[in-house]
Structure formats: structure tokens, C-alpha cells
């Protein structure tokens, strides 16, 4: 007869484990049996390890080595509590706890260890000159920065920072603007130099202060493209007007004309800038200069434009466009006095100098009513400095001349200057007392060979209304050289 009740199969070793845990509980008599049982099986598993020992032998050895010690005083429950307590303290140390204000003191904050999981990098505001400070990301040993240091400043101006510290903006555009601001601040004290970009600058209004010295510097930057590279050439032209008061005898005028006609052959490198003598402004002098700038590369014009600059008696208005600007000077001077006009050109960026060339020196008697001076100059700036050796030929009042300096690898610069000296008395000119002076020089190119150099200046005398300003530059005429003679 078959029984209908199911038959239960007891796994091997279960009886041995239950007997072992029962003996351990009876020997140690723990307060919490559940926690003791968990610690018992955990210690048994650690004691077994990776060995393949029979469960009966394992429980027997475990009771002889471990359970006997637990009965003496150290129980697995206490061991388990000791293991859990350091884990709790380590977790609590990482989580900041809110303390009461009465117990929070500065001394506690000094000895407290702080941890930061996140580190934010910002531009160093307190960087010392010559040394850069970098923050280590993820370095828990260093204390986190204070909120004032971690919050990036909203681009403070460079002047707000003390001289001991330097602010380096993270934005490249701000860095470039800051560097340009420093450069402009360095050159701000040089009031006599005016840097103008013809393509991008806006009209500039400068108040003119009446003084005894009339000097003007104009710097024009023009890009030149050569073999796929863009080169920027800055040309600085200085124009000074020299007016002497009072009338002088004919002997002094003759001496001055003779002295001015001597060519400057001994001077190889004249100074780039000469001090303008004092000028007392009394009558009306109108000087209108026309500057024509064009770049030539391999006998092909690249950039061409005319620059006009207009100057009024009380202010200088400089309107700039892509190709045109006008200069017009109205100054006060006595109707009759000797005058000299000097124009100088230098190259600022590449530190190449173009020697100064004296265009014209006019001396007239007190009876002259007006003098019209027209000059044209064309110069090519080369890698070597130009040395001018002007000579003064004898020509009539209606003669015209030009200055032209050639080079193959240079910027072609043409300058035309018209000087009009008016007189309110309206006296007629006298042919007997006229003293024409014209100058012709040959600037010598040091280094590479250049084209033929010819220079000249035209002087026209008129008593009628002012002639119109030249609309463009005419082709320069080559004039023969000669010695200066006064007619």
C-alpha cells in the first residue's frame, strides 16, 4: 500500500549547521538572537574561505576555534557593531551637518576638515606678476576656495585692479581689447602723433590751440598685399611752417638765399624730425596739402587713393573715407615775411627711415601780395634708408617739378602739396624784387639699386583770388640740375 503524503528530503549539512548555531547561542547567550545568527554565519563563511572541507568538519573546527573565544567574552555581535560604527562615522564626516549657532565657533572652523567634490576653475584674479597660479581639479587635500574667489568677476576694468595684481580675462576678445587698451594708454601722452586708420576710423574733431609753434604729424596705415601676405606700412609725415616777423634788408635776404642754395652733400643721415621754430600768427595763411598714396608691386598698382585733410582756424576736422580726405590749414601770419615749408616722411612699423627732404624755402619782400606754392612728391619706401642730397637749380617762377624715388619691392607714395599765402592788402607783385627758389635733390638708395631720382618744387606768384585745389596728381616732370641763381 502506497502512502499519499509527500516525502521531504533534508539537504546535507542542514542538521549540522542548525546544531552548531544552537550550541553557539546556548554558550554565548546573546541579547539579539537574529543579529547573532547573522554574525555567526558571516564568521563561518569567512573562516571557510575557498577551502573544500566537509560541512561537519568545518562546523566542528569553527566551534573549537571561534565559538570558544566568544563564550569567554568577545561575541560576534560586538564585533559586528565595532565594524559598523567606523563605517557610520566615515559616512557622516562626508555629509555636512547643520550645527547650532551657539556651539559654532571660529576655533571649531579652524580645526574642521572640509571636503569638496566639485572644483570650478576661473581666471586667477589675484595672480602675482611673473607667476601663474593654477588650481588642481579633484585635489581633496586643499581647502575649497571661498565663494568670493569661486564666483567669476563680471569683467572688471583693468584700472580697477591694483598695480600688484593683473587680471587676465578668459575671453580672447576681452584679452585683445585689454592689450589694445594698454598700448593706447602707453601712447596716450604722445599728443603730437595721430594714428588714423583710413578704412575704419570715424571723423575726428580736435581743438586747435593757438601757439607759437605749428607742427602736425599724420600717420596713415595702408595694407599692402605681396605674394599672398598682407603687410602694413605706416607713413608718418610732419609738416612745419616757419614764419619770421619783421622785414629784413636785401642783404640779409641775399645771404639767406645763398645759404639755402648750398646742397646738403656732407650730411648722409639728416635727423628725422627737426624742431619747428616759433611762429607768431597775425595774418591769414592758407595751406592746402594733397597726399596721394598708391602701392605698386612688380610695376602693377595694387592700392590707390587720395587723402585730403582739412584744417579750420579753431578746429581740425578730419573726415575719412576709403579713398578721400582733405587737409586745409588756416593760420595767421604777417603779409610779408620769409617762409619755409619742410615735409618729412618716415616709416614707423618696420623702423625704416626716409630721410627728410626740404621741398621749398621762399623769401619775399614786403611788397609781395601772395605766393602760390605747388609741389608734388612720389616716393618708394624700400628696405634701406633713403639719403637726400638736394640741389637748388635756377628756374623761373612758373616752373614745376616733382620728387620721385623708385624701388622694386616697396610701397609707392605720391604726395602733392599746394601752399597758398594770401594778403589782405592786395598789393601787386613786383618782378624786380622777386626771389625765386627751387630745389632739386637726388635721394640715394642704400642697398638695392633703384630708379632714377629727381625732385623739384614749383613756385607760382599771383595777386588775384586763390587758385582752385588740384583735383589729382599730374605726371612728374624731370628737370635738369643746376645751381641756384636769384633773378
Swiss-Prot record:
Region (Disordered), start-end ranges: 78-163, 243-271, 420-487
Ranges of residues in domain RIIa: 12-49
Cellular component terms (Gene Ontology): cytoplasm; cytoskeleton; sperm fibrous sheath; sperm principal piece
Ranges of biased composition (kind: Low complexity): 140-152
Example GO molecular function: calcium ion binding
Gene Ontology BP, a term: sperm capacitation
Compositionally biased region (Acidic residues): 478-487
Annotated Pfam families: RIIa (PF02197)
PTM entry text: Phosphorylated on tyrosine residues during in vitro capacitation. Dephosphorylation affects its ability to bind calcium.
Protein name: Calcium-binding tyrosine phosphorylation-regulated protein
Amino acid at each position: 500500500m502506497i502512502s499519499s503524503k509527500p516525502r521531504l528530503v533534508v539537504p546535507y549539512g542542514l542538521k549540522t549547521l542548525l546544531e552548531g548555531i544552537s550550541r553557539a547561542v546556548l554558550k554565548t547567550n546573546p541579547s539579539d538572537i537574529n543579529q547573532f545568527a547573522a554574525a555567526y554565519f558571516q564568521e563561518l563563511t569567512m573562516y571557510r574561505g575557498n577551502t573544500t572541507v566537509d560541512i561537519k568538519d568545518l562546523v566542528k573546527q569553527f566551534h573549537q576555534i571561534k565559538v570558544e573565544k566568544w563564550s569567554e567574552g568577545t561575541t560576534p555581535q560586538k564585533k559586528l557593531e565595532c565594524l559598523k560604527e567606523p563605517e557610520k562615522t566615515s559616512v557622516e564626516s562626508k555629509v555636512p551637518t547643520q550645527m547650532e549657532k551657539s556651539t559654532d565657533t571660529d576655533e571649531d572652523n579652524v580645526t574642521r576638515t572640509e571636503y569638496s567634490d566639485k572644483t570650478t576653475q576661473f581666471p586667477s584674479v589675484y595672480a602675482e606678476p611673473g607667476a601663474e597660479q593654477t588650481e588642481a581639479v579633484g585635489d581633496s587635500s586643499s581647502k575649497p576656495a571661498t565663494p568670493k574667489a569661486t564666483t567669476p568677476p563680471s569683467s572688471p576694468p583693468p584700472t580697477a585692479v591694483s598695480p600688484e595684481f593683473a587680471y587676465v580675462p578668459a575671453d580672447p576678445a576681452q584679452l585683445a581689447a585689454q592689450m589694445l587698451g594698454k598700448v593706447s594708454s602707453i601712447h596716450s601722452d604722445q599728443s603730437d602723433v595721430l594714428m588714423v586708420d583710413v578704412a575704419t576710423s570715424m571723423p575726428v574733431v580736435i581743438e586747435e590751440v593757438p601757439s607759437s609753434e605749428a607742427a602736425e604729424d599724420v600717420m596713415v596705415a595702408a595694407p599692402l598685399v605681396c605674394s599672398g601676405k598682407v603687410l602694413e606700412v605706416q607713413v608718418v609725415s610732419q609738416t612745419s611752417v616757419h614764419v619770421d616777423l619783421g622785414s629784413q634788408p636785401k642783404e640779409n635776404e641775399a645771404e639767406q638765399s645763398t645759404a639755402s642754395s648750398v646742397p646738403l652733400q656732407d650730411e648722409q643721415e639728416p635727423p628725422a624730425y627737426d624742431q619747428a621754430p616759433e611762429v607768431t600768427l597775425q595774418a591769414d595763411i592758407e595751406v592746402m596739402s594733397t597726399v596721394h598714396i598708391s602701392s605698386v608691386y612688380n610695376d602693377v598698382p595694387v592700392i590707390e587713393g587720395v587723402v585730403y585733410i582739412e584744417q579750420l582756424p579753431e578746429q581740425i576736422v578730419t573726415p575719412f573715407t576709403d579713398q578721400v580726405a582733405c587737409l586745409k590749414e588756416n593760420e595767421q601770419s604777417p603779409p610779408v615775411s620769409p617762409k619755409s615749408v619742410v615735409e618729412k616722411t618716415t616709416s614707423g612699423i618696420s623702423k625704416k627711415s626716409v630721410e627728410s627732404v626740404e621741398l621749398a624755402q621762399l623769401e619775399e619782400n614786403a611788397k609781395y601780395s601772395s605766393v602760390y606754392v605747388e609741389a608734388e612728391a612720389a616716393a618708394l619706401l624700400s628696405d634701406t634708408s633713403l639719403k637726400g642730397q638736394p640741389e637748388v637749380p635756377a628756374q623761373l617762377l612758373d616752373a614745376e617739378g616733382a620728387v620721385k624715388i623708385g624701388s622694386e619691392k616697396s610701397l609707392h607714395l605720391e604726395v602733392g602739396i599746394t601752399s597758398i599765402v594770401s594778403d589782405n592788402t592786395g598789393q601787386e607783385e613786383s618782378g624786380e624784387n622777386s626771389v625765386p627758389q627751387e630745389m632739386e635733390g637726388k635721394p640715394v638708395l642704400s642697398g638695392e639699386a633703384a630708379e632714377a631720382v629727381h625732385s623739384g618744387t614749383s613756385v607760382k606768384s599771383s595777386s588775384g583770388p586763390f587758385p582752385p585745389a588740384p583735383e589729382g596728381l599730374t605726371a612728374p616732370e624731370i628737370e635738369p640740375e643746376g645751381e641756384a641763381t636769384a633773378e
